[in-house]
Amino acid sequence: DRSPSRGLGDVYKRQVYHPQVWTPKEAKKADLLVVALKYNALLPALPSIKEAVGENTVVMSLMNGVDSEEIIAKEVGDSHLLYSVIKIASHKEGKGFYFAPETTIGIIFGELEAPFDSERVQAIEELFGRTEIHFRATKYIREEVWSKYRLNVCNNLPQAILGAGVGCYRDSVHMKAISDKLKEELEAIALAKGIDMSKVENTSTQRSAVPPSARYSTLQDLDAGRQTEIEMFSGALIRMGKELGIPTPYNEYTLSL
């Protein structure tokens, strides 16, 4: 493959893979259940998730946003959730999604409270260690989840409004200003919740090489005529802002658009 990056999804090293598909009944009592869905697919999937979860099943949600774990926990119980996030900068070309493996952070996971090196954390580390998956366990998983949430709100949404590539934040002071205002609102809410994202600044800033024309997931959804995850991004932030008495005018404007 002469491409500087490798394909993710239906194209990987120019090969097509067909994943093995199980029904929830067939997957019942699996040791590990990874939830990787678009936000609008989560609620319809909850009955299937519940059916697949057994007494000792660990559930990891790699979804965007900051509330998927809470939604899943209401269905299966808090004890099954191991908080996690995936950080990978990819862009679509033809039928494939491409990324740079050497700069991809991958999956980050951990317990919300001590012991942070729990038996299940060690088990996931051992499992992923036998694969090519990039991963890291952390004791600051809540901050990591919110750090990605911030990236999505600040980088995904403004470019989606105008239909511009990610280079718009570098080329336009106005786009950068919108991104900064969305960021300020999110950080104010995070601070009110006791979430200090500075704890993960040094470990979550590795960036994949993305061309200025790259269109992130929200804009890709609009391009394809799909429902976006704006409700998970700005919608959730607005709700949290109202609960905490923190104004979120830029997110309200973005949601309305």
Which stretches of residues belong to each language-model region?
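Helix-loop-beta segment of a Rossmann-like dinucleotide-binding subdomain
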Residues: 53-56, 98-111, 162-169, 214-224
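Rossmann-fold dinucleotide-binding core
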Residues: 28, 64-144, 148
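Active-site-proximal catalytic alpha-helix in oxidoreductases
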Residues: 142-170, 174-187, 213
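Single conserved hydrophobic/aromatic residue that forms the stacking wall/gate
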Residues: 1-8, 12
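Short, structured loop/turn "capping" segments at alpha-beta junctions
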Residues: 134-138, 160-168, 196-198
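NAD(P)-dependent Rossmann-like dehydrogenase/reductase catalytic/cofactor-binding core
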Residues: 129, 180-257
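Rossmann-like NAD(P)(H) cofactor-binding subdomain of soluble oxidoreductases
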Residues: 13-98
